[in-house]
Amino acid sequence: ADYYYDYTCMETLQGLSASELSSVDGRKWRTTYSDPDNTKREGLDSTVWPKAFERMEQFIQDTGLSQDDLDMNYDDIVEMYQSNKLAMYFGSSAGVKMFQDQGINTTFLPFFQENGEKWIMTTPYFQVALNSNLTKDETRRKKAMKVLDTMLSADAQNRIVYDGQDLLSYSQDVDLQLTEYLKDVKPVIEENHMY
């Protein structure tokens, strides 16, 4: 993976421990951690995170991850994959298409968990923050909600999708077809094992 970028370490940590982070304890921790009304500083708990870091440590040992790996960017990783120096890389369905178009046999795999579950990382995610002052001005709140409704609409989401790039929608009223590049993880998506 392109560990040069700080988000890759977090995505790897989360991907390796998606089942724990999606458990009752994991959801409870995430809810408390991200609650804007929580005035108590919330750190890593002693239930979910020790296992997550143990798994990350095992991953580092198993893969032989070194300081040199931490300095590689996305282009370095792509070049190594194209020249058969890497067996796997962390990417998207668009990457699968790109490599298949180059004649490289590539498939999309989920993160395999110790409990037998399979999960896929859904990044980048769509996150929105609305200013609490909107509750004081109904006209502005309605305008903000109209923008949000438009962004979450089926039309807007279908415009995002382009040849070989998938979009997994959390909106139940949006029907998006997966490209052939995610066919191998369709059961994982149908089980809603997306983190």
Task: Cite the ranges covered by each PLM segment.
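Long, aromatic- and glycine/proline-rich binding clefts that accommodate carbohydrate-like moieties
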Residues: 109, 161-195
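Paired acidic/hydrophobic, glycine-rich loop segments that form the ligand-binding mouth/hinge
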Residues: 87-92, 107
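Extracytoplasmic/periplasmic substrate-recognition and gating elements
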Residues: 100-168
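Beta->alpha turn/N-cap motifs
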Residues: 74, 90-96, 124-126
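Extracytoplasmic/periplasmic solute-binding protein
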Residues: 1-41
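Hydrophobic residues within well-ordered alpha-helices
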Residues: 10-13, 79-84
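Short helix-initiation/N-cap motifs at beta->coil->alpha
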Residues: 67-82
